[in-house]
Amino acid sequence: GLIMDNFVLTCCSTVDLDEAFFKKRHIPFVCFHFRMDGVDYPDDLGHSISFKDFYDRIRNGATPTTSQVNSSEFIEFWEPFVKEGKNILHISLSSGISGVVNSAILAQKYLMEKYPGSVVKVVDSLGASSGYGMLVEYVADMKDEGKTLEECYEWAEEHKLNIHHWFFSTNLTSYRRGGRISSASFFLGQLLKICPLLNMDYLGRLIPRKKIRTKDKTIIETVNMMIEHAEDGTNYNGKCFICHSDCLDDAIKVKDLVESKFPNLKGKVRIYSVGTTIGSHTGPGTVARSEERRVGKECRSRWS
């Protein structure tokens, strides 16, 4: 067991975890970008612009646009490791919401040709935000246990659809702007205080599933979905992450309800901020919850 598999685990900034996570786990990440009020920023965990400021500007009418990591940025990001003789396992944001995995694959091919014998593997997480982050963390746990790159890669491919992602939103403005809902639905939704409940399907796309009146009912429903789908129901003993776009009170309500219904959780529910890439599309007022679930593909496809 002395020969450690010499590889680096990397991911995109869109895992929406915090800086402490990356430092503690030694996971380098590559930043998406966004443009707001004519200025370009990296999606860098709230460094260049605080999350509060970012979401306040959207509330005041700013319309940020995002751009993914291109292949030359991936090459720049990975090449120093490959030069040192390290192999790379990269877990990417879902191909269902971004073309970034294609950029990663172009860079992978380029580097493996330039450095014969090097290995770069890319996993399409089919997830987003802290559910995607959860997949990365599980793989980091395996890496720390001494599993090889190949073992980690195979596990991620086999289990990535076992992460369940549910989102709800209390502010429909950005959804209307992004064309996810029609103007008519938007006005009706505002009138009736409707919160759409969305999830990720088996192709990693964000799909509206239910329309629920009032936030409180939506919070109850999102936890009911967890009871229905989590492995072992309320005896679920895995992790649960919650991500919010500047609506901490709502995230705490979900956390409290989850912790009261699931006494055997692994650690407490962890709350993170939705970063600027995903947040450019959701706007403020979105809460995302993720956990592992009972069955693999069947569950996501049943909702698809």
Question: Which residue ranges define each predicted feature?
Answer:
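Short, Lys/Arg-enriched N-terminal segments with co-localized hydrophobic residues
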Residues: 1-3
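Mixed-charge interfacial surface used for oligomerization/domain docking
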Residues: 6, 14-22, 27-33, 38, ...
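N-terminal glycine-rich anion-binding loop in soluble enzyme alpha/beta folds
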Residues: 8-73
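Short beta-strand/turn micro-motifs composed of small residues
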Residues: 11, 92, 244
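A short glycine/small-residue-enriched secondary-structure motif
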Residues: 48-55, 78, 83, 110
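Glycine-rich phosphate- or other oxyanion-binding loops that anchor nucleotides, phosphorylated ligands
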Residues: 59-95, 102, 106, 153
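Short, flexible active-site-adjacent loop segments at beta-strand->alpha-helix junctions, enriched
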Residues: 94, 126, 299
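Single conserved hydrophobic/aromatic residue that forms the stacking wall/gate
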Residues: 292-304
